[in-house]
Structure formats: C-alpha cells, structure tokens
C-alpha cells in the first residue's frame, strides 16, 4: 500500500517534471486520428508540416473519439447563374489597392500577431477599430460588430454581422484569420505574417469597405444575414474558428455557406496567374458555385487544388455541419514558401492578386445575399 502510493507519487512527479505547467492538448490530425500531446509538442508538429484541429475544449469523450458524432453537411441548391452583375461590377470597379496596401502595411507592422502575445491582442484592437470606422455610417439594427472572447487567450475573434431583411436566419459567412506565427520561436521572434494570413484579412476588409460604400449606404440590404469573421488563433490548431462554429452549431444557427480567404497575395509565376480552388475537405456544391463566381467576375482563371486535412478555418465550419469552401492564391504547390517566418513580408505580395480575391468575396456576398436557400 505504502509502496504503491509512493510509486504513484513518483510517476506524478516525473510527469510534472517533464511537462511543467503543460496540460495535455487533444489534437485531431486526420478523420480518424486523434492524439494527446503537451502544448509545446503542437509547435513541433506544425514545424513538421502537420495540421490539426485542437479540439481540447470541444471533446469530453476522447480518446474514444467517434467520427459518427460529426454532423453531415447538407447540400443546398446554390444559384446556377449570377443575377446581380451590375451591382457586383459596380463594387469591383472601386477596389482600392492603395487602401489595401495601407491596411496590410499597418497589419504587418505588429511585431507578431501570435494569438497568445500582447502584440496579438493589440493587432485585434487595431482591426476592430478599423472595421468600426469602415462601417460607422451603418445603423446598428443593420450592422453589429461582436468581439468573440475565447477566454483561454487574449486575442479575440471579430464577427461583423449584416442582419438580413427577409430571412435573417439564413447566414452567409466570409472568413479569414488575423493571427500570424513564427514557427521557430513564436513568443520571441517576429512574424509579420503578410501573406499568412494578413492578406486574407485585408482582402476581406476591402470587400467589407466596398460592401458598406456601394451596397449598404445606398439603402440596399441583403435578404440573408451576411457575416465577416476575423478569427483568432488559426495557427494554434484552428482554435478560434472551432470556438465560433461549435457555438453556432449549439445555437442551431443556419449557416448556408462559408468561404475562407487565407493567403491571397503571392504569385509565383506572373505568366501563369490563377487562383487555387480547394477541392478536398470542402463542400462540392458550394465549390461549384464559387467557380461560377470566379468565371463571372475575375480576370484570371481558377485551378483545382488540394490542401489536406485541417488546412484552414473552413474546416471548422464543415466539421460542425456547415458548407465550407476555400480559395487560395494558387495551386497549393505554388503557394508562398516564406510563410511562418520573418520573411513573410509585404514586398513579396501582389496587390492586384489580392484584388482578384476581393472580387470573389463581393460576388459571393452580393449573389448569395439575395439567394433563397429553399
Ligand atoms: C476613418 O476612416 C476615414 C476614411 O473613411 C479616415 O480618413 C480616418 O483616418 C479613419 N480614422 C481612423 C481612426 O482610422
Ligand atoms: C428580398 O428582399 C426584398 C426587399 O428587401 C424583397 O422585395 C424580396 O422579395 C426578397 N426576396 C426574397 C427571395 O425573399
């Protein structure tokens, strides 16, 4: 008895010594693959290129994780053709690369936007204030800005909500993540995160600015609710978007479409400029609709590409039963090699390419804003 409890004590001491202050995290690294690791091991995995959902907060029954628990994503009949060409073209015309440059310069001037750092909180504060300024003339019964507090870390997610006029319960979401990371030493080294993923955030900010200027201010209002999400902590295992979509699923919200923008600015070969539309772990019917938008409104083509499991925040939508899609700067193999380092800087990006991504966002929210899900 005595020996046994000594033995237990010894083991506890060993574990405590090995992982001081490090509670285990539960990671889902594949559809049927779950592992438990200390916090510091998450970084090692990322450095080796492994992507995952950190589901620690959202699973109580592990390690007996059951895939059947994941809801299936319903298929909706998205519009087979576009019907708002004039309005969309009118907005696209006004895309301002100068404004995008200014926002990205400011956003990348934070030493890092690592979600656990004070800098990461400050960058969220700047983003929230800038969004409030962009949308300040829209009355509160139409537009609200929510600071989604994650409790475990300081950098909050931001949800901009344009409430629909006739079917506000049907929700269309545009997402991007605001955090950046230096995978070498995240708490110490710089991570300007221009492409990854400041570019997605700035692409969506510009779309929000034009949506405000050319649409809402002219008295238009979408039938469905349109939301812009700026997620915290993507780099920690999609933590921010998992919190948001898990809450939406619990509240039984009806998300009819989600489009993620993440890495929108790098062009490896200007002679062969295109966007990459991600076909794995996304929702086929929605992906087809996004292709229609690209064909209708962009001056460059798309190419199908694959990005792997838990690639970006759209994965948090689909694993909660909501349709998700993802358009990235190019075919995956041609994407920016400088991400997650001090070299992910603004001078390596193309604002014209980011503007093409902004067109996708405007096309999607204006077309789906007036679409009837039934
Ligand atoms: C708010 O936006 C206007 C342009 O619409 C700009 O001139 C002004 O500097 C902005 N203010 C802040 C605090 O960002
Ligand atoms: C969309 O809203 C407008 C008014 O804002 C209304 O006239 C129209 O019937 C609505 N469309 C649908 C499909 O509900």
From Swiss-Prot:
The keyword Transmembrane does not apply. Keywords: Aminopeptidase, Hydrolase, Metal-binding, Protease, Signal, Zinc. Its EC number is 3.4.11.-. Residues 1-18 form the signal peptide. It holds the Pfam family Peptidase_M28. GO terms for biological process: proteolysis. Zn(2+) 1 binds at residues 177, 196, 262. GO terms for molecular function: aminopeptidase activity; metal ion binding; metalloexopeptidase activity. Belongs to the peptidase M28 family. M28E subfamily. This is Probable aminopeptidase YDR415C. It comes from Saccharomyces cerevisiae (strain ATCC 204508 / S288c) (Baker's yeast).
């Amino acid at each position: 008895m005595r020996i046994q409890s000594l033995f237990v004590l010894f083991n506890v001491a060993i574990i405590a010594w090995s992982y001081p202050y490090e509670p285990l995290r539960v990671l889902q690294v594949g559809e049927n693959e779950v592992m438990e690791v200390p916090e510091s091991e998450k970084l090692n995995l990322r450095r080796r290129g492994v992507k995952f959902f950190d589901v620690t907060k959202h699973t109580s029954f592990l390690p007996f994780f059951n895939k059947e628990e994941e809801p299936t994503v319903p298929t909706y009949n998205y519009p087979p053709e576009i019907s708002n060409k004039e309005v969309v073209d009118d907005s696209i015309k006004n895309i301002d690369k100068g404004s995008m440059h200014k926002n990205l310069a400011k956003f990348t001037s934070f030493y890092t936007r690592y979600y656990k750092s004070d800098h990461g909180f400050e960058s969220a504060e700047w983003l929230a204030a800038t969004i409030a300024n962009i949308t300040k003339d829209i009355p509160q019964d139409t537009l609200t800005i929510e600071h989604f507090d994650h409790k475990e870390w300081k950098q909050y997610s931001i949800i901009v909500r344009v409430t629909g006029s006739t079917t506000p319960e049907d929700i269309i979401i545009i997402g991007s993540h605001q955090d950046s990371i230096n995978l070498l030493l995240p708490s110490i080294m710089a991570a300007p995160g221009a492409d990854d993923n400041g570019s997605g955030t700035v692409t969506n900010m510009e779309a929000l600015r034009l949506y405000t200027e050319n649409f809402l201010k002219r008295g238009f209002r979408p039938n469905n609710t349109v939301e812009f999400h700026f997620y915290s902590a993507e780099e920690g295992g999609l933590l921010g978007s998992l919190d948001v979509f898990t809450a939406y699923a619990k509240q039984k919200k009806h998300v009819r479409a989600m489009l993620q923008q993440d890495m929108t600015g790098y062009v490896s070969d200007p002679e062969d400029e295109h966007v990459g539309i991600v076909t794995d772990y996304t929702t086929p019917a929605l992906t087809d609709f996004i292709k229609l938008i690209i064909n209708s409104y962009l001056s460059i083509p798309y190419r199908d590409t694959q990005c792997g499991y838990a690639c970006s925040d759209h994965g948090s939508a689909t694993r909660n039963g909501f349709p998700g899609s993802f358009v990235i700067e190019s075919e995956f193999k041609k994407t920016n090699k400088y991400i997650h380092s001090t070299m992910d800087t603004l001078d390596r990006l193309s604002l014209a390419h980011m503007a093409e991504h902004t067109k996708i966002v405007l096309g999607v929210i204006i077309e789906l804003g007036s679409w009837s899900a039934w």
